[in-house]
Regions:
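Flanking helices and flexible, charged tails adjoining ferredoxin-like Fe-S electron-transfer domains
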Residues: 1, 146-147, 152-189, 195-197, ...
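Cofactor-cradling patches in redox/metallo enzymes
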Residues: 1, 16-23, 355-359
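Immediate flanking context of iron-sulfur cluster ligation sites
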Residues: 3-6, 85-97, 209-215, 239-247
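Gly/Ser/Thr-rich loops at beta-strand to alpha-helix junctions
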Residues: 8-18, 43, 293-296, 320, ...
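A short alpha->loop->secondary-structure connector
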Residues: 23-38
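Short, conserved secondary-structure transition motifs
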Residues: 39-52
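Long, compositionally biased charged/polar accessory segments in the mid-to-C-terminal portions
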Residues: 54-201, 310-311
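Iron-sulfur cluster-binding cysteine motifs and their immediate structural context
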Residues: 107, 112, 199-216, 222-240, ...
């Protein structure tokens, strides 16, 4: 993948795909992702059903400037200055159903996890998970990029409560799916040896049957990214095959976050730890960058670029033809990171598209 290093910001499923791609690089080709910053995520939304829902409320998608999740509300900021909001509990009609088999709220396999739950207004909760993540956060604090203090007991209890709610709800859902013959492979505990054995038998046709056709695809774009012959394409709805796979290629099946996950990545009993495995948890703010919940992700990305820790970072901007649609891209420019700070929690479903476009 060359010598370039990238910092990825993504949802739990995207971070999991990045982890699998690099762990099994002899099968997937690897990636330049060197730092993984995961976002807290309860669920994502289907643009198709969101469009239908908004139309029922008298709003067209082209009238929307941006979407945000704020204080338990789903908020649409319109181009004309008006604001439409509903409680998160009422977003069920346009929630992506594949999100209901995920039990990871805090991006458990990232280096650093970031979200708003558990910290005061204009601050972010930061979970430090790896030694690499600790070195980054310690340096950000020491050099003044961020200010941090240990999360309060009340804040951590709230965070654990929300994470447990996702685990409890979605465990019930995926077990029901398994009971009626709709496989949820990512929740089946298997060893590393079993993982290699199973995935080495599978190609895109198997991915189609085991993940896509049963409604488990999260549109992360990992399969498209790792395909060595560009046989997989993703439109706005699902991955499709446009030509035959190479005979001995199993890259897409190894990379997908909704196929098997070995206990080397997700240790047994991880769901019993609502916040996953971690080293430290902080409440953090970054006064130098104006962004949602303190601009903390942006401050970390600026630190990584200014100190040559990575060459590029992933940020979310606006699709020029559809401002409401978040678009992920890679940049080495500090000004791009600062400009994107206000879109911190706008997550884009096709998370690997920026890397694919760079190939």
């Amino acid at each position: 993948m060359g010598n370039k290093k990238t910092a990825m910001v993504g949802t739990p499923c995207q971070i999991l795909a990045a982890t699998k791609i690099n762990r099994y690089e002899e099968k997937t080709g690897g990636s330049p992702i060197d730092v993984k910053i995961g976002l807290f995520c309860m669920e994502n939304f289907s643009y198709q059903y969101l469009k239908r829902y908004l139309k029922s409320q008298g709003i067209e998608l082209f009238e929307v400037k941006e979407f945000r999740i704020e204080k338990g509300q789903f908020v649409a900021y319109l181009i004309d200055g008006n604001v439409f909001k509903i409680p998160i509990a009422e977003t069920e009609p346009f929630t992506r159903k594949n999100c209901h088999i995920c039990t990871d709220y805090t991006s458990d396999v990232s280096d650093i996890s970031v979200g708003s739950v558990g910290s005061p207004k204009y601050q972010s909760t930061v979970i430090v998970r790896t030694e690499k993540g600790k070195q980054i956060i310690d340096a950000c604090i020491a050099e003044g990029y961020i200010e941090a203090e240990p999360i309060s007991k009340k804040g951590q209890e709230l965070l654990e409560k929300i994470a447990n709610q996702k685990i409890t709800k979605n465990t019930r859902i995926y077990k029901k799916r398994e009971a009626i013959g709709r496989p949820v492979l990512s929740k089946r505990q298997i060893s590393e040896e079993e993982f290699y054995d199973e995935c080495s038998k599978c190609q895109f046709d198997n991915l189609q049957n085991d993940v896509i056709s049963v409604g488990a695809c999260v549109l992360c774009g990992a399969c498209e990214y790792v395909c060595p012959i560009e046989a997989i394409q993703i439109n706005n709805r699902k991955p499709v095959s446009i030509k035959e796979c190479e005979e001995e290629c199993h890259a897409c099946y190894f990379a997908c976050p909704r196929t098997f996950i070995s206990d080397a990545i997700y240790p047994e009993g991880l769901d019993e730890q609502p916040l996953g495995e971690y080293l430290e948890i902080y409440s953090v703010k970054a006064d130098s960058i104006m962004g949602q919940d303190g601009g903390v992700v942006s401050a970390i990305l600026v630190y990584l670029l200014e100190n040559d820790i990575v060459d590029e970072v992933s940020v979310v901007g606006e699709d020029k033809d559809a401002p409401w649609r978040p678009e992920s891209y890679l940049t080495s420019k500090i000004q791009d990171v600062i400009k994107a700070a206000g879109t911190k929690y706008s997550t884009t479903t096709i998370g690997f598209k920026a890397l694919t476009n760079k190939k």
